[in-house]
């Protein structure tokens, strides 16, 4: 999965997919009542990027729905996965469940079109704080009470705080999560970070007792760091330059081992060689 980083304006969806992304990451900020409010990152952000592009969250969802609904004039067949980077740092810990419920209702109405031929992309809820695990249970409760528990089939999870792998496993246990797990690891492109924890995550993914289904690394903008991440065995790379990742995937060393995921590749299934 080539994951376009910080896609917060509707116009950027086309831009990143046209550069080669089959997945996008979008920031979600919350108001003081735990309603998802804007797709907005803010300052500071990655080096070389404008930090302040934004939409109202529900409007972004409508644009995203068009981009992922077959038959729509804005449809992109290859856009198959969306990561919502949930900026829950502005919330109290006890608001996490509410944030999940409100997020689910927004998605149900504006993205999934109340279960009637909505957008088809798989969704990853990426949460920065392990203490906010109730966002997951709240999200699930809301979809169930709204009569659409089947949409949970399209939803996966990530804790993005670079926490100890064992602590992450524990948070999922508390949230009752037993699958659909992406594990992110990384740092802003302004700084360097080694691949030690990525290797631990990959080892967990590939062990019979692991909880991780997919591992992605962020934010990778250079060819050599792309090669290093692929050599470590990641499933996804988040980038400001999808074309760079696509170029490396075309190199003879990687062409035989990797390909760009399509809609038929289940993002919740661990890839077995």
Curated annotation (Swiss-Prot):
Tissue pattern of expression reads: Expressed by the venom gland.
Q: Which cysteines are joined by disulfide bonds?
A: 45-51, 47-190
> Biological process GO terms, please?
killing of cells of another organism; lipid catabolic process
Binding, Mg(2+):
25, 27, 85
Which keywords describe this protein according to UniProt?
Cytolysis, Dermonecrotic toxin, Disulfide bond, Glycoprotein, Hemolysis, Lipid degradation, Lipid metabolism, Lyase, Magnesium, Metal-binding, Secreted, Toxin
Which E.C. number(s) belong to this protein? 4.6.1.-
> Where does it localize?
Secreted
Top EC class for this record: lyase
Recorded hits in InterPro entries, A to Z, give: PLC-like_Pdiesterase_TIM-brl
Question: Which cofactors is this protein said to need?
Answer: Mg(2+)
Q: Which is one GO molecular function term here?
A: toxin activity
Glycosylation positions in this chain: 250
GO CC terms of this entry? extracellular region
State what this protein does: Dermonecrotic toxins cleave the phosphodiester linkage between the phosphate and headgroup of certain phospholipids (sphingolipid and lysolipid substrates), forming an alcohol (often choline) and a cyclic phosphate. This toxin acts on sphingomyelin (SM). It may also act on ceramide phosphoethanolamine (CPE), lysophosphatidylcholine (LPC) and lysophosphatidylethanolamine (LPE), but not on lysophosphatidylserine (LPS), and lysophosphatidylglycerol (LPG). It acts by transphosphatidylation, releasing exclusively cyclic phosphate products as second products.
Family, similarity comment: Belongs to the arthropod phospholipase D family. Class II subfamily.
- What is the protein's name according to its record? Dermonecrotic toxin LapSicTox-alphaIB1aii
